[in-house]
Amino acid sequence: MICIKNGTIHTAVKKETFKGDILIQNGKILKIGTDLDGQADQVIRAEGLEVYPGFIDAHCHVGLDVFAGGPMGMEFNETNDPVTPQLSAVDGFNPFDHHLELAREGGVTCIATGPGSSNAIGGTFAAFKTVGTWTDDMVVKKAVAMKCAFGENPKRFYQNKGIASRMTNAAVIRAALRKAQIYLEKVERAQTDPAKYPAYDQKCEALLPVLRKEIPLKAHVHQANDIQTALRIAKEFDVNITLEHVTEGKLNADKLGQSGVYMAVGPFYNSSSKLEYKNVDPATAGILSK
């Protein structure tokens, strides 16, 4: 066992900190208290140091956008079809991506990673530990959300292949969800009569956890109109949704606050690369938290 001794402990549950020990066994926290070092094989002196739980990155592409990999290292954007809910982050994840080491060094111990924002519907995000060399052993949960995207990226990737406007992008998402709804209705009717089970549809099957509220839509949104469209569609189909990036969220902070929707805000370092970044503001997260 390992004991982290006399550190200032932040629990992430309470604002108050306290000085104490953390006893660890087989990589898991066994006990938090004082004078626990007598039970340990190894003692790490933490006097004067701040001790935090591992950080969780709720939205990234680590393991699928491989460090210094160039085009061949980019596994997170599928550009042959704008609707690919059947894709899984687990199948593209590279456990040897150097980004994982960088994440660990920054204190990140768990990540939600998955498809990028080229597609209207991109596939499932998964949760991974950042430690390990075998993908299946690193998986915390295989499906945590279904990626969808609004705004410039789907337009740019598919402008000559079916999506040239925000209106079309929204319509494509609606069409996929409605098709899956009809499929789900048939599946439910087949519970009492297996002969009525619909012909297998891989895309519809992948969207069933969304419609059943087992996982949320994970919506890539920057502009205020895209944020509003994402929430509109979630309401229409009665599904859960989280908002990612939310660059112009401060413009409708009151409405977003009333929505109760969870948001992952940022990043803030690329304000000049796209039109939809023009209102980027590091203060947005603080404004929304109020």
Specify the residue positions occupied by each region the protein language model found.
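Polyanionic/metal-chelating signatures
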Residues: 99, 104-241
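Histidine-rich, glycine-flanked metal-binding segment
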Residues: 9-52
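Metal-associated gating/positioning segment near the N- to mid-region
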Residues: 49-115
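His/Asp/Glu-enriched, well-ordered alpha-helical/loop segment
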Residues: 67-68, 74-80, 84-87, 216, ...
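Histidine-centered divalent metal-coordination motifs
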Residues: 6, 59-63, 220
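A general structural motif
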Residues: 198-200, 219-223, 244-247, 273-281
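Divalent metal-coordination and catalytic microenvironments
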Residues: 7, 22, 27, 48, ...
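Active-site-adjacent beta->alpha loops and helix N-cap segments on the catalytic face
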Residues: 248-258
